[in-house]
Amino acid sequence: MSGRLIGKVALVSGGARGMGASHVRAMVAEGAKVVFGDILDEEGKAVAAELADAARYVHLDVTQPAQWTAAVDTAVTAFGGLHVLVNNAGILNIGTIEDYALTEWQRILDVNLTGVFLGIRAVVKPMKEAGRGSIINISSIEGLAGTVACHGYTATKFAVRGLTKSTALELGPGGIRVNSIHPGLVKTPMTDWVPEDIFQTALGRAAEPVEVSNLVVYLASDESSYSTGAEFVVDGGTVAGLAHNDFGAVEVSSQPEWVT
């Protein structure tokens, strides 16, 4: 690796497995020091042991303000500051609008939206003190377009997209950038029950976690120094349009004339 993040300290939520663990490893590989949190303590401790002195694991329930404060304090105490936040933690639940329980709705808002808000709020002070910062909010393509039966997930991911923009405007004068990443289907433990071909993507496959992590590294680095309030899509072409794969088998001469 080329040391693109040397001198930076990052905090990652939901970092014990899946995309979060991939983000942690990718940033450490580029020279960052990383504090990462999760509620999956055994898995988190295993990742921390693998990365040795470059990383610290903390228990972090993103719905709890005090645990965010403790995570930030760990970063500042252990590594001398904080420059990057990756709001990665999230959950998915599904159900028809008629049957979707209020408790499920409230739970997903607490984790996917309030958790992001609390994370942003917790890192502003140390980032202002550093005179710079990069906040990376992991949204989803469901933050760009709706999906049937994913009502809470879609609502929270749209909201994260909006929160990204309002905080980018507020924090920009302090040198703090805020951007959102919108992955499509990614191969993680959270999505291992989802058929890989559920979306017709231009590339014809789901993403590997590292393909999202590569973008996280870019946004954490100074290479993205003029990017803020923006949406970065990593979806294999899912939201580019409908992939009518059967059209390729139709002879051009046999296509009817369509009138709109």
From Swiss-Prot:
Binding-site list for NAD(+): 17, 19, 38, 61-62, 88, 153, 157, 186, 188, 191
Pfam families from the UniProt entry: adh_short_C2 (PF13561)
Source species, domain of life: Bacteria
Key words, A-Z: Lipid metabolism, NAD, Oxidoreductase, Steroid metabolism
Associated pathway: Lipid metabolism; steroid degradation
Top-rank EC class of the record's enzyme: oxidoreductase
GO molecular function, one term: androstan-3-alpha,17-beta-diol dehydrogenase (NAD+) activity
Reaction equation(s) it catalyzes: androstan-3alpha,17beta-diol + NAD(+) = 17beta-hydroxyandrostanone + NADH + H(+)
Xref: CDD domains: 3beta-17beta-HSD_like_SDR_c
Subunit and interaction comment: Homotetramer.
Entry's family note: Belongs to the short-chain dehydrogenases/reductases (SDR) family.
Function field: Probably involved in steroid metabolism.
Protein's UniProt name: 3-alpha-(or 20-beta)-hydroxysteroid dehydrogenase
Provenance organism: Mycobacterium tuberculosis (strain CDC 1551 / Oshkosh)
